[in-house]
From Swiss-Prot:
Lineage, top ranks: Archaea, Thermoproteota, Thermoprotei, Desulfurococcales, Pyrodictiaceae
Amino acids binding Zn(2+): C20, C23, C35, C38
Free-text comment on the cofactor: Binds 1 zinc ion per subunit.
GN (gene name): rpl37e
Name of the protein described by the UniProt record: Large ribosomal subunit protein eL37
PANTHER family, alphabetized: 60S RIBOSOMAL PROTEIN L37, RIBOSOMAL PROTEIN L37
Length: 62
């Protein structure tokens, strides 16, 4: 098999994300070694932003 379009079909065989040890979500990137949801592996502090929560009546709820 060459290096063109047919080869790109073989790129989705392995796992990109597994279950995170800290938050339990399916967002731990095996190749990069950190969780996309909570930041485990990249930071000791929990990854948290204000835009993650939904606004109701212009007040951000948790």
């Amino acid at each position: 098999m060459g290096k063109g379009t047919p080869s790109f079909g073989k790129m989705n065989k392995n796992y990109t994300h597994i279950r995170c040890p800290r938050c339990g979500r399916h967002a731990y990137n095996v190749a990069k070694g950190y969780c996309a949801a909570c930041g485990y592996g990249r930071s000791r502090r929990l990854r948290r932003y204000s835009w993650m929560n939904k606004k109701v009546n212009r007040i951000r709820i948790r």
